Amino acid sequence: MASIDILGVPHAYDLTAPTAEPHVLVFIHGWLLSRQYWQPLIDLLSPTYQCLCYDLRGFGDSQPIPISDSNSQGTSASLKANNTACRYAPAAYARDLGLLLERLNISSAWLIGHSLGGTIALWGAAQLPYCVKGVICLNAGGGIYLKEAFERFRAVGERLVKFRPRVLCNLPGIDWVFTRDSVARPIARYWGRQRVIDFVMAHPEAARGTLLDSTTEAEVNRLPELVSRLKQPVYFIAGAKDTIMEPKYVRHLASFHQLFQACGDNAIEIPDCGHLAMVEQPEAVAAQIRNILSHHPG
């Protein structure tokens, strides 16, 4: 694991060796997760493509440095200013990504984002048109604000992030519960354990901030316009049994892009797959990624 300071926060990342392919695949994880879940895909794709995965600010190993008592007074004002500027909105995380790519001298990239990471990838494509050559959204979609559903989701999410004691990691059988959450079939116990760790370790401010800033009515309604403005190719991969981001909502957002035709050329559905496609069906996802990239070689 390597680390780069981005706006005062150490960002953990893994970068595989360069290959003959001109584009770097950049993997962006979702809410309360980390870069770890991309490893099955990276193992399959890194022989052909250089791959970068990193932990979003406040998640995984990208944790803010605690403010010491000696300088807390001087920094409190700047922190308050940052907090009022939607620093946990997807667009803010896309700016973090732009700085990371600049620091790593990556000038040609395809962004592959899961769930919230997909939204960040779309914003990244809008902010970095010279660098981002295309986007693949995994288990990501939306663009329809259903007031009651979103209010319920935000309320449940806030309760979740409030009750995350570290001792939860030691609770017998808790990893078994996480192997069955939001997936079509139970995933390996290893991944259940990883999900518990990432759930508990996410920074409280980031966990709550990303939830609230990414699910406002304005933010959700902005997505279709964002997708429609993108000149780069954008593809959406859905899990047929995803109950978090149902395929119909994935296709809805995909339909605003120029690649979408009567048959939905840029919307792909993977059978027997829930909300963690990169862990549940890595071979199928890798095959779709290879196929997409083969149509955009330059």
Label each region the model flagged:
Residues 6-9, 14, 53-112, 116, ...:
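Active-site loop/oxyanion-hole signature of alpha/beta-hydrolase fold enzymes
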Residues 22-30:
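Short beta-strand element of the alpha/beta-hydrolase
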Residues 29-31, 109, 113-115, 239:
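Conserved alpha/beta-hydrolase "nucleophile elbow" surrounding the catalytic nucleophile
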Residues 30-40, 51:
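Serine-hydrolase catalytic-loop signature spanning alpha/beta hydrolases and amidase-signature enzymes
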Residues 126, 133-166:
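Flexible "cap/lid" loop of the alpha/beta hydrolase fold
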Residues 147-148, 168-229:
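Conserved alpha/beta-hydrolase catalytic His-Asp/Glu region
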Residues 229-273:
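Conserved loop-alpha-helix segment in the C-terminal half of the alpha/beta-hydrolase fold
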Residues 273-282, 286:
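Catalytic histidine-centered segment of alpha/beta-hydrolase-like enzymes
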